UniProtKB/Swiss-Prot annotation:
Protein's cellular compartments: Nucleus matrix; Cytoplasm, Cytoskeleton; Cytoplasm, Cell cortex; Membrane
GO BP terms, alphabetized: actin filament depolymerization; cytoskeleton organization; cytoskeleton-dependent cytokinesis; regulation of cell morphogenesis
GO molecular function annotations of the record: actin filament binding
CDD domains, sorted: ADF_cofilin_like (cd11286)
One Gene Ontology cellular component annotation held by this UniProt entry: membrane
Residue span(s) of domain ADF-H: 4-153
Protein name in the entry: Cofilin-1
Taxonomic lineage from the root: Eukaryota, Metazoa, Chordata, Craniata, Vertebrata
Keywords assigned by UniProt, alphabetized: Acetylation, Actin-binding, Cytoplasm, Cytoskeleton, Membrane, Nucleus, Phosphoprotein
Motif Nuclear localization signal per UniProt: ranges: 30-34
Family: Belongs to the actin-binding proteins ADF family.
Amino acid sequence: MASGVMVSDDVIKVFNDMKVRHQLSPEEAKKRKKAVVFCLSEDKKMIILEPGKEILQGDVGCNVDDPYKAFVKMLPRNDCRYALYDALYETKETKKEDLVFVFWAPEEASLKSKMIYASSKDAIKKRFPGIKHEWQTNTFEDINDPCNLAEKLGGSTVISLEGKTLKS
């Protein structure tokens, strides 16, 4: 079921900037987004950037010690959101960096919110070509555990996320 919700040009630009990993100057690299949260506009007709809900690569190691935990803290407890998270992880063979599309639909969200976000998900996914990993999660218990994200990224072959060794 399509909701008729549109995706703002700003959302598409952020996706394209996060997806393309070309050679950046050190200053440009610091401004690259590590994580960003999207929400519906007040009139529920447009998917937009949620103001103030982003982590820049330059924040990591400075005022953000654990980017994954900081990302989780940006999500509301009682409403749905979409997000992009640029995951840096290591498998038994190599280090990797992949974008993950997250659909956050907490159990505490209203039924109306869950329905409109679920029916609008395809609108945003169609504007994000090439995303390898999609994760729908419904509880803070699930999203708080980085092992659950690691499972989406490669299962038992993932040994660390954001430089932190995962528990087996």
